[in-house]
Amino acid sequence: MSSDQVHLGHRARKRFGQNFLNDPYIIDGIVSSINPLPGQNLVEIGPGLGALTEPVGRLVDKFSVIELDRDLAKRLRHHPDLADKLTIYEGDAMRFDFTQLIKPNNKLRIFGNLPYNISTPLMFHLFTFHEHVEDMHFMLQKEVVNRLAAGPGCKAYGRLTVMAQYYSRVTPVLEVPPESFTPAPKVDSAVVRLTPYEVLPHPCTNLKWLDRVCREGFNQRRKTIRNCYKALLTVEQLEDLGVNPGLRPENITLQQFVKMANWLDANHQNA
């Protein structure tokens, strides 16, 4: 058993995408950015060996955790300081119904060091509960954080950017080097804060259409808007919507994507 795969007696499981955070300075920075307070409806995804769970547990009385690895869930159940504070849900966060954690007038505050192999689909799952969430703090691949926070005209701007910014304000918090983990991942990491809007600034009448215009555009990034959407919208219709047909999809703002989606929803039967 190689020592670089083992932390606190637990061997990292590749199939769960486990990399355990072990840098006290970084841990302190993450917990400070979360700023957990007693009485808040806190939920940690993938607590692992408790790098964030333990310091958060010192600041609050009760919170929930979702852990897929049975061995790690068992460790938490027997943790001398955390056992009485935690409500442990054993299972896959990708399939978890977060509405079961809703409390009156106490929105969810979700945080975690997400497995990088599922981080993007997991965020899409979490966005479906956006109206019940106050904020989310996640450790992700730095490249994913760059995509979340990107603006139009930048290489990192894509479908994930548009969908994340449709639901929330995106704030990069801090960067994390590979040596802050055991085992060290092959990529740089970063922490991001996602704060869902109480009122969506650019509401879409049918999210299937928004997803479709994003997919069709960003799957053909080098094509112009007129060529990406020629089966859906004429040049005149694009111009009426304030979209320059000579631009590429990466130059289109969130508001323009929503305008296109809403027009298509009003004028076509199925997304």
From Swiss-Prot:
First-tier enzyme category under EC: transferase
Pfam family, one: RrnaAD
Protein residues bound to S-adenosyl-L-methionine: 19, 21, 46, 67, 92, 113
Location in the cell: Cytoplasm
Methyltransferase among keywords: yes
GO cellular component: cytosol
Primary localisation category: cytoplasm
Reactions that this protein is recorded to catalyse: adenosine(1518)/adenosine(1519) in 16S rRNA + 4 S-adenosyl-L-methionine = N(6)-dimethyladenosine(1518)/N(6)-dimethyladenosine(1519) in 16S rRNA + 4 S-adenosyl-L-homocysteine + 4 H(+)
PANTHER family membership: DIMETHYLADENOSINE TRANSFERASE, DIMETHYLADENOSINE TRANSFERASE-RELATED
Family under the similarity heading: Belongs to the class I-like SAM-binding methyltransferase superfamily. rRNA adenine N(6)-methyltransferase family. RsmA subfamily.
UniProt-recorded name of the protein: Ribosomal RNA small subunit methyltransferase A
Species whose genome carries this gene: Photobacterium profundum (strain SS9)
Gene: rsmA
